[in-house]
């Protein structure tokens, strides 16, 4: 984080690259994320820019334990894989580059801040800080309210992104998110975090 304490990541601040530099833009980004059930066990997400261009697509298991999700670019190339780590008091996911499961390809780990909470609250640990048993200091934190799957993402005290839930045909498994990504922030990282938070909190 910059030396001067601020409440929001801004133009000119250092890039926050978690997945890849190619997903960091020097300006704020407004994204629309659409989620739809594909069949009984699978659903998918599509991410669009304000012009309607497809940027990312995520598919995988909608229910169950040890879930796996895959993020791809518009051409279908795999960017990263998200895997839920079985039964635990605190939901935990590991995210690797491509289809890998290898430790050296680990991008980040996501874990619920508390075992039981009515609000969105998750911690993100980068590989050099992913031994959550030895440290309680996370690299990023996402927190939200009680009523829906809306939350904000912080690096220390600085806001780096915001996710807003919007109602759609909820009974049909369709709903959207509006995402605001601050300048120089890796939007693929923010979208992956959104999907894992949604999976943790939604069973529809």
Swiss-Prot record:
Pfam families: LOR (PF04525)
Assigned protein family: Belongs to the LOR family.
Stored PANTHER family: PROTEIN LURP-ONE-RELATED 14-RELATED, PTHR31087
Free-text function comment from the UniProt entry: Might be related to the phospholipid scramblase and tubby-like superfamily of membrane tethered transcription factors.
Protein name per UniProt: Protein LURP-one-related 14
Species whose genome carries this gene: Arabidopsis thaliana (Mouse-ear cress)
